[in-house]
Amino acid sequence: MTEHQAEEQADTPPTKVKATPTPTPSGKFKDAKEDAFLSTSPDSANGDAQHKLPADQLAMSSSAHPQQAGQARPLILQAFHRCSSPEQCVTLHDILDSFKAPLSEDQAWALIHQFAGLYHQVAVQAHTCAADYEAALPTGFELHFHRDGSVHFSGPDQLTPKEQLQQEQIPLPPQHDVIVDQPDHSASSSGDSSVINRAFDNSNHHHHHQHHHPPLVVSHRKIISELAEIVYTALDYNLPEDEECQVSQELENLFNFMTADETDDDCIDEGIDEGDKRWDDESEEERNDTKELEHIIETCRNHIKTTLPENHYRAVCRALVTETIELRVFLQQVLNNEAGAEKLIKASESSATTQQELAKLGFNDWARFWVQVIDELRRGVRLKKSNHERTPIEYELTPYEILMGDIRAKKYQLRKVMVNGDIPPRVKKDAHAMILEFIRSRPPLKKASDRQLGPPRMCEPSPREQLMESIRKGKELKQITPPEAPTLRERVLPSANSTLSRSRQRLIKVDFSKFQDDDLFYDENSISSSHSTAATHQHHPHFAEMHRCSQPKMPPYPFGGYMVPSQARQDCRETASLMRPRRTMEPAKQVPPPEEPSFTKDEYHKFYDTALESYDLATQCESRRASLRRHTIVGCQSNLDETHSMPPTRPESRQSDDVSKETPKRSPAEQTHPSDEGSSTSSLGPWNKSFMDKQTWMERGDDRLSVTLAEIVHIRSVMTKAELEGLPMDVRVKEDVEKRRVCFLCLRTRFSFFGPWGIQCKLCQRTVCAKCYTKMRIPSEHFRNVPLVLISPSLLSSPASSSTPSPSHHAQQAHSSSTGNIMDDQFPKSLIERLLRSESDRKTRSTVGSAPSSPKHQRSNMSTPGISVGPGASSSSAAATGQAVEALHDQATMSSSYSAAMRPSGVHQQQKQHYNNAMSRSMEGPRSLPVHSPAYRPLSNNSTLERKSRFSRGFNLFSSGSHLAQTQEQKENLRGEQVTVCNDCQGLVNEITSSVKQKRSSARNRTIQNLTLDLTPVWK
């Protein structure tokens, strides 16, 4: 506002407005019109939808119908019209008088934008009625706000009766004068009302100047100037006379532009781009008429950085109206309605605050508290960080000097002063609580129990939700009966179809009267296999031994051999005489299963006689035996034929005349059972019997590696890390094992600082306890021809020397149970420990249960030169010279032990002795031959024994005398240094060493066998 305008306003007498305050004695609202206005609430009849024809819609609808010249009055009434919904309309004076506080700067920007935009819609059509447009403008107007955010002007002039008849289509309700009651002591604002009256005064002070612009521009400038004065007065409302409102520089520049003098051309064109493309199609006159309004609107839009400034300013106006109406409703409940006031006071007051203290608050106090609460809700309350650092105490200056220094440095904080100075903080706090309680109750909410939610929308679940739902439901498993325990025949000689599940097979009894029993039956596979192979035995005799190649799938075991449960020994003795050997193999092509046949006694004996003849013919000469080895289980592995230099055991019934004389009427089953047992045990070594799976040998049997000790250490460390990933996570076992707190193998011994301490394995880097480790010698740094299955993590199993299983043992046990391994829970622990004893224990004891030692093993020890059994022979030299011999006969030892476990006592003891004698003669030749003949070779031949005897004698001579200490040192170097290894690594090294020794000795025996005359076929 310029000084010239201030002087003109001082000279011009103020005009009164319709909204005049009238004081009331008790601070209550007595006027009926005011009560009607105060009873309006935000949720009454949905006020947002009740207003009719907002100002902007009226302007847009009327713009489609251009007005004729001389009809300026209806055009101006589009903006300066009387509101048709007074209950939803609030004037600017009502807003200021309700809050008793000035507007904020954001609200001032919203007022300027909304009213400038409304007047711009009328100004763009003012050139059609330029003759009487200025005369139709009202001499004073007031700003009105609707609850939806729209605005309009209100002029004090009345229409003539003739004009009212012309505007019948436009509803014009009677003028509604809002009279605001003032409280007795705090609602006086006479000085502020005079300022508003001066703003509403239209003294036409612009007419005494010279008009350099068109009449429309002057009219627009008059409206813009009055709008700026009204907004500035609202910003300066209820402030002291000596205090000026603080506005930003941008808003101050806008006020200067809106109130600029008519002769100031620079201010008119300020910020206007002459080359703007918006006015390229308009005339120069229309462009100059509204450029001030467009500049004002553009400035307001640039002030807000949002994409839609119109929505923002509309929301500000809507919030201003809503807060005013809510405050009036709240004051009406507190000051007029005792029931509502008591309810709010009881909901918010504390024990120290009374109803009388809250009732003492005046209108201005409640309005100020309302503004504070709304400001906190909009801006939020942030807690300041408390500074706990205490400043050092000042002793050099006196308190007076410290105070004066703070005043000079302006180190002080201004305290907030109460309005009346007597409102305690607790009352202020309770007043805020009352206001918040009122805000929460608007609109009233229903109880959660009374609410009824509609049906949920049926939406199609996403693929992820479907997957999670299927995981939650789980898969229903079918009810299956537990599998029956397999018989001994199924364990030792399973069906030909090894890939299918093990099926129950019928045992053919010699008692032919019970041959067709209902409880015994054949399955289709066994019947078809018997028929298909019976016809091929005469033409293909090598098929007789091929059946032994098909064994049940089982993981390889380091020490090999099928185990027999102790509780099944009685069943073995009962069914041994009832079982016939199945020497046939499943043909290459399956035939459809025929009907179940019925055998006669002649057909029964003829069938097995043919099988025995084929077996005898196939084992009479060396070429036949080589052909047999290629088609049996030995042929499934390329290196397995090198481990057996002796011919397989012949049928017992064809080799023992004494036994056949004693039992001339033995049944075919009893005659062939020992040969079947011998061929299934003695022909397979302890390591080979653990690889009975044909597919395993086809895939991994030929794989051998040449690795060093460092590579084995690396492989074992990788396998250790893999086993760590398989440990359970929920019981902290994995964490303890990783941090080396618990033994890796037994998972029972816990290490501590005071003991026991863990020992780290040199190969796999595991930390084990004293029970799970041992010290052994590793004689070589490089191992050749190491089978791949020994270092494979899926095939390697932990040794049984440890009484407690390792983590890998649990995984292998689960694997064996799923693949049908015979090592199930039926085997007693004592039998497993005896069968899985370490190599040194098996060599010293070489027995299982009560069975005697193998005659083959005893004979080899007695007949081998260089082995001393007397007291003068040293144990170390005997062990050194007999190590190779015992390694060669390890297979025969396990075979005899296995047969002894099946028939430990009774009549079977004599049969076992006869079986061992027959096996020895079949491998050594007839008894009539001399001991040193080529046919009689317990190991390989004469030359081998002679070389070993010479080496043993030379070694004994060299060991005597002064060279004994040096010899012992050399022996220690050859045997290797003792290292600490766990039980798993010990079994691995033992198996690698024995496999390498077996490979070396079998290759040597095969070479000697080719150069030696074999007289076994000519012996009869």
Curated annotation (Swiss-Prot):
Keyword entries, A-Z: Actin-binding, Cell membrane, Cytoplasm, Cytoplasmic vesicle, Cytoskeleton, Developmental protein, Membrane, Phosphoprotein, Protein transport, Repeat, Transport
PROSITE patterns with a match to the protein in the record: KIND, WH2
Annotated spans, Spir-box: 705-725
GO terms for MF: actin binding; microtubule binding
Domain of life from the UniProt record: Eukaryota
SMART domains xrefs: KIND (SM00750), WH2 (SM00246)
CDD domains assigned to the protein according to its UniProt record, in alphabetical order: FYVE_SPIR, WH2_DmSpire_r3-like, WH2_DmSpire_r4, WH2_Spire1_r2-like, WH2_Spire_1-2_r1
WH2 domain sequence ranges: 399-417, 463-480
Biased composition range(s): Basic residues: 205-215
Primary location: cytoplasm
Similarity comment: Belongs to the spire family.
UniProt name for this protein: Protein spire
Source species of the chain: Drosophila melanogaster (Fruit fly)
Name of encoding gene: spir
